[in-house]
């Protein structure tokens, strides 16, 4: 039997509605079929879009190794001798046709970090624009712009470091609008009892993009040269943009091929949750404690996420001393686990709500706790098992995999508390959550001057502590119902 959607709730206050599951006495509407539906087509295309997005984001970190003259970085070699080198280096035919640049470690840091300085700027504007004109064009142009800029990366590198830094910042500007725009679109497309499934499918593309692009970029660098890394992913992004603009619509009402039944199902499920206000209630938004609960959780989660995303290959190489081929595969493995976990958790979260009558806030709290405390435990464990290579890789993989639970927790709570302003809210939380990407790796580098296991234990413990704090704060102050300021009639509504 297909899942049922609860109908409109009464005008209970927010406190009571926060813990109320599906109402047995409420009018229920049968869910539209999943197969060949417009909403799941949107989720799949969004999945492909975020796959491309993260491939465009992380490909430079791999290509940079091949772009830099190895003689420039010999003095920066900080490989630890605490752990034995457990495998002989593998000699692979290497194509040397790509140009080399004499960039020291500091210059490379600026090149890699410049992305976030653009990324942080367009978060809130992206959410606001998407709430006004729709997310389809904004998200499409964001990925298209990033793809085009990526094609010019080899030229920018030839023109100099400053040009390349500016180009990467421009790519960040383009990518900065994408997540808020996607959230804004789902506010019109995702029925409340399918939010976890639909959003985790779409955003899981980011994890798989990381999994595929890391080793693929390395293969391209070895057997062709680094310039083709940017050409390949740039062209794929342009092809995706054409499909996106052709197939997708901003709302069910404007979709050309959606069935009448599916359109009615989506519209009726959201009719009591969306606001008709023309003015954004900025004051109420910024004073909302449930929003700040998401901000703290998002910031805390991203601290460990970005620390591992940027430094895991370094830890694998300099502490565990894996060779470059093993490093590429093992660094991607945790993100495959996270991708799989996100997909399964989206299904599980909505199943708990529909079949077991779990309230929205209960589901969000449970999945946030598992997705933040679990990774913290295994991250600390990875730092304290020394040179046990198998356990180190296993613990780091489990840590990142468990982070996938959070995708059905705080990550989509914006749509629970204010669906009409979900893009703006995500822009706000992602602005704060980008700060760890700018500062976390720098702090981690400063804490590991001698590159010892004890120093890395400190890095992992700090990340774990921040994760646990964020999980506790979210559990205490998060809400699961639409807030009164997010409704035009200012009456809270059960979600």
Curated annotation (Swiss-Prot):
Sugar-modified residues: 71, 77, 95
Function: Multifunctional anion transporter that operates via two distinct transport mechanisms, namely proton-coupled anion cotransport and membrane potential-dependent anion transport. Electroneutral proton-coupled acidic monosaccharide symporter, with a sugar to proton stoichiometry of 1:1. Exports glucuronic acid and free sialic acid derived from sialoglycoconjugate degradation out of lysosomes, driven by outwardly directed lysosomal pH gradient.
Protein name: Sialin
Knockout or disruption consequences: Mutant mice have smaller size, develop severe tremor and uncoordinated gait associated with marked central nervous system hypomyelination, and die prematurely during the third postnatal week.
GO molecular function, one term: D-glucuronate transmembrane transporter activity
Annotated InterPro entries: MFS, MFS_dom, MFS_Na/Anion_cotransporter, MFS_trans_sf
Primary location class: membrane
Region of interest: Disordered: 1-25
Keyword Cell division applies: no
Family: Belongs to the major facilitator superfamily. Sodium/anion cotransporter family.
Location(s), subcellular: Basolateral cell membrane; Cytoplasmic vesicle, Secretory vesicle, Synaptic vesicle membrane; Lysosome membrane
Transmembrane domains' residue ranges: 42-62, 110-130, 137-157, 159-179, 201-221, 228-248, 279-299, 329-349, 366-386, 392-412, 424-444, 458-478
Recorded catalytic activity of this chain's protein: N-acetylneuraminate(in) + H(+)(in) = N-acetylneuraminate(out) + H(+)(out); D-glucuronate(out) + H(+)(out) = D-glucuronate(in) + H(+)(in); 2 nitrate(out) + H(+)(out) = 2 nitrate(in) + H(+)(in); L-aspartate(out) = L-aspartate(in)
Family matches, as SUPFAM superfamilies: MFS general substrate transporter
Cytoplasmic topological domain: 1-41, 131-136, 180-200, 249-278, 350-365, 413-423, 479-495
An annotated GO BP: response to bacterium
Membrane topology: Multi-pass membrane protein
Keyword Transmembrane carried by entry: yes
Residues exposed to the Lumenal side: 63-109, 158, 222-227, 300-328, 387-391, 445-457
Record gene name: Slc17a5
GO terms under cellular component: basolateral plasma membrane; cytoplasmic vesicle; cytosol; glutamatergic synapse; lysosomal membrane; plasma membrane; synaptic vesicle membrane
UniProt motif (Dileucine internalization motif) ranges: 22-23
One Pfam family hit: MFS_1
Record key words, sorted: Amino-acid transport, Cell membrane, Cytoplasmic vesicle, Glycoprotein, Lysosome, Membrane, Symport, Synapse, Transmembrane, Transmembrane helix, Transport
Tissue specificity field: Expressed in hippocampal neurons (at protein level).
């Amino acid at each position: 039997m297909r899942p049922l959607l609860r109908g409109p709730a009464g005008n209970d206050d927010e406190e009571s509605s926060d813990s109320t599951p599906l109402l047995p006495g409420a009018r229920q509407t049968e869910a539209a079929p999943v197969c060949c539906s417009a909403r799941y087509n949107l989720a799949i295309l969004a999945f492909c879009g975020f796959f491309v997005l993260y491939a465009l984001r992380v490909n430079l970190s791999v290509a940079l190794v091949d772009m830099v003259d190895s003689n420039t970085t010999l003095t920066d070699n900080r490989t630890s001798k605490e752990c034995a080198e457990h495998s002989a280096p593998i000699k692979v035919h290497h194509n040397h046709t790509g140009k080399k640049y004499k960039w020291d470690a500091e210059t490379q840091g600026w090149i890699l970090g410049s992305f976030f300085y653009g990324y942080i700027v367009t978060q809130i504007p992206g959410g606001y624009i998407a709430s006004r004109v729709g997310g389809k064009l904004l998200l499409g142009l964001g990925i298209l712009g990033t793809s085009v800029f990526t094609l010019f990366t080899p030229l920018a590198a030839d023109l100099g470091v400053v040009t390349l830094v500016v180009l990467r910042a421009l790519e960040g500007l383009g990518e900065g609008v994408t997540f808020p725009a996607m959230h804004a679109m789902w506010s019109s497309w995702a029925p409340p009892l399918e939010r976890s499934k639909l959003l985790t499918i779409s955003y899981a593309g980011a994890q798989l993009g990381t999994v595929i692009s890391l080793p693929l970029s390395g293969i391209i660098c070895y057997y062709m040269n680094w310039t083709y890394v940017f050409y390949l992913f740039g062209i794929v992004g342009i092809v995706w943009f054409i499909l996106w603009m052709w197939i997708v619509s901003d709302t069910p009402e404007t979709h050309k091929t959606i069935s009448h039944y599916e359109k009615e199902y989506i519209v009726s499920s959201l009719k009591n949750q969306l606001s008709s206000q023309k003015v954004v209630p900025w004051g109420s938004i910024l004073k909302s404690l449930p929003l700040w609960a998401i901000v703290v959780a998002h910031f805390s989660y991203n601290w460990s996420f970005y620390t591992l995303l940027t430094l895991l290959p370094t830890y694998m190489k300099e502490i565990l001393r894996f060779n470059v081929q093993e490093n590429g595969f093992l660094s991607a493995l945790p993100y495959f686990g996270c991708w799989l976990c996100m997909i399964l958790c989206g299904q599980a979260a909505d199943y708990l709500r529909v079949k077991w009558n779990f309230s929205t806030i209960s589901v969000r709290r449970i999945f946030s706790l598992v997705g933040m405390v679990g990774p913290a435990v295994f991250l600390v464990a990875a730092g304290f098992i020394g040179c046990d290579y198998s356990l180190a890789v296993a613990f780091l993989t489990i840590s990142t995999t468990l982070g996938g639970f959070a995708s059905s927790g705080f990550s989509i709570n914006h749509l629970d508390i204010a669906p009409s302003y979900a893009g703006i809210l995500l822009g706000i939380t992602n602005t704060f959550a980008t700060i760890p990407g700018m500062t976390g790796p720098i702090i981690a580098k400063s804490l590991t001057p001698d590159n010892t296991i004890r120093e890395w234990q400190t890095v992992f413990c700090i990340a774990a502590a921040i994760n646990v704090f964020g999980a506790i704060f979210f559990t205490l102050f998060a809400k699961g119902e639409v807030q009164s300021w997010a409704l035009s009639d200012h009456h809270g509504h059960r979600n």
